[in-house]
Amino acid sequence: MAAVSMSVALRQALWGRRVATVAAVSVSKVSTRSLSTSTWRLAQDQTRDTQLITVDEKLDITTITGVPEEHIKTRKARIFVPARNNMQSGVNNTKKWKMEFDTRERWENPLMGWASTADPLSNLVLTFSTKEDAVAFAEKNGWSYDVEERKVPKPKSKSYGANFSWNKRTRVSTK
């Protein structure tokens, strides 16, 4: 009910502004654009965005994507979580699931010597927050897919004193 009463209050405030704008235009005889109308439409669009439409049945959208059929039917997608960068200790890049496609034929461009391909999906990498979202997207587009499960590293229990032990390789003299 709060959204409805807010809308009514906004309508009354904007209607008052519109009447004042119309009166000002009629007095000055200069055509100016009424801003209150666009503000009212903006307020209505914001209320429409909050109402989501959910479709329970699975839709096949392969015919309307614009991708040639040979790239849809024979396409294999790989769904995975990227590995941590070995040069850094952070794991921020390993939170999202990624989908990439198999490599198709490439050739060397005779003019510039660059690697060329006729595959529109070759350099496409999609990012998803969950594995289920990635699988649903692949099924919706009609692609076959392989899922590589996330590899969770086992924490190694070490003591700080192990860094200074004399019988380990860490304390071998370099002289």
UniProtKB/Swiss-Prot annotation:
Record-listed Phosphoserine modification sites:
S173
Q: Where is this region: Disordered?
A: 149-175
* UniProt-annotated location(s): Mitochondrion inner membrane
This protein's major location comes to mitochondrion
Q: How is it modified after translation?
A: Phosphorylated.
Its signal peptide is: none
One cellular component term from this protein's GO annotations in UniProt: mitochondrion
| Any single GO BP term | reactive oxygen species metabolic process
Q: Which domain of life is it from?
A: Eukaryota
Gene Ontology MF terms in the entry: NADH dehydrogenase (ubiquinone) activity
Membrane topology per the entry is: Peripheral membrane protein
Q: Where is the transit peptide?
A: 1-42
Subunit comment for this entry? Mammalian complex I is composed of 45 different subunits. This is a component of the iron-sulfur (IP) fragment of the enzyme. Interacts with BCAP31 and TOMM40; the interaction mediates its translocation to the mitochondria; the interaction with BCAP31 is direct.
Please describe what this protein does: Accessory subunit of the mitochondrial membrane respiratory chain NADH dehydrogenase (Complex I), that is believed not to be involved in catalysis. Complex I functions in the transfer of electrons from NADH to the respiratory chain. The immediate electron acceptor for the enzyme is believed to be ubiquinone.
Q: Which family does it belong to?
A: Belongs to the complex I NDUFS4 subunit family.
What protein is this chain from?
NADH dehydrogenase [ubiquinone] iron-sulfur protein 4, mitochondrial
Its ancestry begins with: Eukaryota, Metazoa, Chordata, Craniata, Vertebrata
